């Protein structure tokens, strides 16, 4: 109502997360036994006044909240600008390379090289997996693998490493792009890529357009996807029972 009176358009983007109630776990039901959760909300707008109005209204949390609700941040937050990362390629002959050793600067000439052919890379395939007459047991992925994740702009990178080489073929067989896509369905706007690294018994997943802009451009509480590996490790995966004994 206030924004309408001031002829200010609606927010460009909003984010509401209930931390502590599986807000990061796609398609998973809430935990009704939770006794404490944190409500986080954020918004984007081209007019700083709109964000200021929202933050001013949030002051009411410290003055007249419903029973059982409290605001724990110190003072009223201030609107902050959105900073985005834009990466691109440029011909090396357009960039001067200089070495500065403190006392002098020396320009280095880098001769042009042949253009790299992406098609020359041979992608490794999944290892053979024989599942005939096998009895399977569903276990959390964390029981048979380690995980680590991070970001590059608006992409998330998840590495999964088998705890034992014997689990690797089964993990590769069942942990595919669809499983990962379903796991992050609430966030994922792009595709999922899978790469096999048999030398380390691991898989690398790249999730495109999954971080809401990534870094300071994202409104989420995990804009760098640092918890994504742990979320994926919660997924159930079928493993031959004989390998678990």
Task: Give the residues covered by each predicted segment.
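Short conserved micro-motifs at the rims of enzyme active sites and ligand-binding pockets
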Residues: 28-29, 52-54, 171-173, 215-219
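Bergerat-fold GHKL/Histidine-kinase-like ATPase
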Residues: 141-142
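Extended active-site and interfacial segments that coordinate phosphate-rich ligands
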Residues: 57, 175-184, 220-229
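Helix-rich interaction surfaces within compact, conserved domain-sized segments
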Residues: 190-245
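C-terminal non-catalytic interaction/assembly regions of soluble proteins
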Residues: 1-133, 138, 152, 161, ...
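C-terminal beta-rich recognition modules with glycine/proline-rich loops and embedded aromatic residues
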Residues: 119-120, 158, 169, 217
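Hydrophobic/aromatic-rich, well-ordered segments within soluble, folded domains that form packed cores
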Residues: 145-183
């Amino acid at each position: 109502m206030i924004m309408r009176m001031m002829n200010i358009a609606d927010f460009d983007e909003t984010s509401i997360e209930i931390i502590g109630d599986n807000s990061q776990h796609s398609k998973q039901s809430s935990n009704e036994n939770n006794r404490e959760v944190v409500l986080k909300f954020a918004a984007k707008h081209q007019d700083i006044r709109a964000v200021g109005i929202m933050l001013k209204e949030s002051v009411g949390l410290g003055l007249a909240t419903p029973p059982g609700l409290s605001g724990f941040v110190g003072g009223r937050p201030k609107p902050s600008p959105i900073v985005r990362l834009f990466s691109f390629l440029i011909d090396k002959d357009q960039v001067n390379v200089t070495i500065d050793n403190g006392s002098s600067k020396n320009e280095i000439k880098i001769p042009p090289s042949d253009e790299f052919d992406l098609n020359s890379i041979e992608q490794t395939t999944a290892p053979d997996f024989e599942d005939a007459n096998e009895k399977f047991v569903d276990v959390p992925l964390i029981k048979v693998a380690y995980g680590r994740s991070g970001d590059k702009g608006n992409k998330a990178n998840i590495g999964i490493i088998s705890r034992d080489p014997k689990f690797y073929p089964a993990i590769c067989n069942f942990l595919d792009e669809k499983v990962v896509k379903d796991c992050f369905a609430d966030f994922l706007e792009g595709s999922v890529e899978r790469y096999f690294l048999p030398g380390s018994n691991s898989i690398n997943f790249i999730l495109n357009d999954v971080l809401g802009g990534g870094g300071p451009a994202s409104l989420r509480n995990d804009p760098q996807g640092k918890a994504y590996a742990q979320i994926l490790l919660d997924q159930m995966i079928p493993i031959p029972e004989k390998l678990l004994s």
